[in-house]
């Protein structure tokens, strides 16, 4: 099955490059303050970043002592940008879908993934591979769009006739699978799965859950127009798990 790669489409990539997180990096990501506190010690570690995008997390790991980092992404455009912004002798970038990554068993200390797993159809297959790649005691830290956010599919508020927000729709929650949604004005394929599926898949494949967080906007951002509405429903789910 051909995997969707919207980020190599020029129009979509141009729109993505204008996003705050694309321009400001980790500090421009609303969840970063929370996610950073979930990260393990990187000193002398072998690190894998699945869906590395511009390479922000790759560079962070190296800056915090990682011995080597492999950043993978399906998008050649993303990796070209990563090499421009975050080239480092300790970072290797590879253009490959995360489901097709091939690594020797028990060779990775830390695996990171930021807002990428919801593009993967076969989540359990990926987690099985991650469990194989990680050394005993190795750590997986990832963020995904929250199941409440992905369930109904439109990923948009319901508005009244005056254009005021009424509520956020949650529907078809237990019907997992493909969702066609709008992102940056384009139709994008994502995959919805329940909170139970995310967490139990980890537990059933040799992981111990260490942290599960639904991040809220930092207090200092709540005065930004529209930001208070982000307190009405979770958008992201952050998980840290350790291979037993």
Per-region residue spans from a language model:
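A short glycine-rich, Lys/Arg-flanked "PGG" loop and its adjoining helix->strand segment in the class I
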Residues: 124-139
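A short acidic, Gly/Pro-enriched loop at the edge of an enzyme's catalytic core
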Residues: 99-111
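Conserved class I S-adenosyl-L-methionine
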Residues: 1-42, 56-60, 81, 140-177
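Short alpha-helix
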Residues: 189-212
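A short SAM/SAH-binding and catalytic strip from SAM-dependent methyltransferases
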Residues: 109-124
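Core SAM-dependent methyltransferase catalytic element
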Residues: 205-207, 225-244
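Class I SAM-dependent methyltransferase SAM/SAH-binding core
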Residues: 48-50, 54-100
């Amino acid at each position: 099955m051909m995997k969707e790669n919207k980020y190599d489409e020029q129009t979509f990539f141009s729109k993505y490059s204008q996003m705050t997180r694309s321009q400001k990096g980790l500090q421009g990501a609303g969840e970063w303050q929370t996610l950073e506190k979930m990260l393990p010690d990187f000193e002398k570690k072998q690190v894998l970043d699945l869906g590395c995008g511009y390479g922000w997390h790759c560079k962070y790991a190296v800056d915090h002592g990682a011995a080597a980092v492999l950043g993978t992404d399906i998008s050649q455009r993303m990796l070209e940008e990563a090499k421009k912004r975050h080239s480092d002798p300790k970072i290797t970038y590879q253009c490959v879908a995360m489901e097709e990554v091939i690594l020797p068993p028990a060779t990775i200390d830390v695996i990171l993934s930021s807002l990428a797993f919801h593009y993967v159809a076969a989540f359990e297959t990926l987690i099985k591979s991650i469990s194989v790649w990680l050394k005993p005691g190795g750590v997986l830290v990832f963020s995904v769009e929250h199941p409440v956010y992905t369930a109904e599919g439109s990923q948009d508020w319901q508005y009244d006739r005056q254009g005021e927000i009424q509520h956020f729709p949650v529907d078809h929650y237990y019907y997992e699978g493909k969702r066609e949604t709008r992102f940056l004005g384009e139709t994008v394929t994502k995959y919805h799965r329940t909170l139970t599926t995310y967490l139990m898949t980890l537990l059933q494949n040799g992981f111990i859950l260490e942290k599960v967080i639904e991040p809220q906007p930092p207090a200092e951002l709540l005065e930004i127009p529209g930001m208070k509405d982000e307190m009405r429903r979770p958008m992201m789910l952050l998980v840290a798990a350790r291979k037993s």
